[in-house]
């Protein structure tokens, strides 16, 4: 049986609290009494916010793929790995002119969706003549997307633009630099260096810990590994 008198006593002994909430316009309010209704008269307006979360740590650096191959599987097919000057990053990294210049990145493989190429020949006047060679391959970060059919075009672009006399670098990026770009680079290293999926994935994660192909892409990488017949 509910004791109404006891409940009333507990209610009266409850401590006042301050509840803060934000409306869709970004206004922040505080209601000082837990027993009061959230009416306009009971609100104390606080400083306005942006209405969205502000990223205080922009992910705007390209990460070099540091290739380390165990001596046990080092062979004539993959002993030239030191000349592979590959980078991975998010869309922010593709806009970081200073970082691209410092790392001698001359080509960018854009496998994201809706990301503009900033340093094109058409924009060279406003970028002090800085020009990047681009290739766009639209890939959706969807477990059902057939990413294997995009491999050949991506590999061809990488092979055509990497290295050279100046050891030019290539940045492979998507929107977040986590799933799509990682999958392309994992598959490229598997084929180029004739190394297993597990090692290629380990190399990517050691260079950029955020790398995490979605489950559908991982399944396709397993299929691709079998096709390579190591």
Swiss-Prot record:
One of its GO terms (biological process) is regulation of JNK cascade. InterPro entries: Dual-sp_phosphatase_cat-dom, Prot-tyrosine_phosphatase-like, Tyr_Pase_AS, Tyr_Pase_dom, TYR_PHOSPHATASE_DUAL_dom. It is an enzyme of class 3 (hydrolase). Residues 78-230 form the Tyrosine-protein phosphatase domain. The active site is at residue 174. Keywords: Hydrolase, Protein phosphatase. Its EC number is 3.1.3.16, 3.1.3.48. GO terms for molecular function: JUN kinase phosphatase activity; protein serine/threonine phosphatase activity; protein tyrosine phosphatase activity. SUPFAM superfamilies: (Phosphotyrosine protein) phosphatases II (SSF52799). GO terms for cellular component: cytoplasm. It catalyses: O-phospho-L-tyrosyl-[protein] + H2O = L-tyrosyl-[protein] + phosphate; O-phospho-L-seryl-[protein] + H2O = L-seryl-[protein] + phosphate; O-phospho-L-threonyl-[protein] + H2O = L-threonyl-[protein] + phosphate. It comes from the Eukaryota. Pfam families: DSPc (PF00782). Has a dual specificity toward Ser/Thr and Tyr-containing proteins. Belongs to the protein-tyrosine phosphatase family. Non-receptor class dual specificity subfamily. This is Probable dual specificity protein phosphatase DDB_G0283417. It comes from Dictyostelium discoideum (Social amoeba).
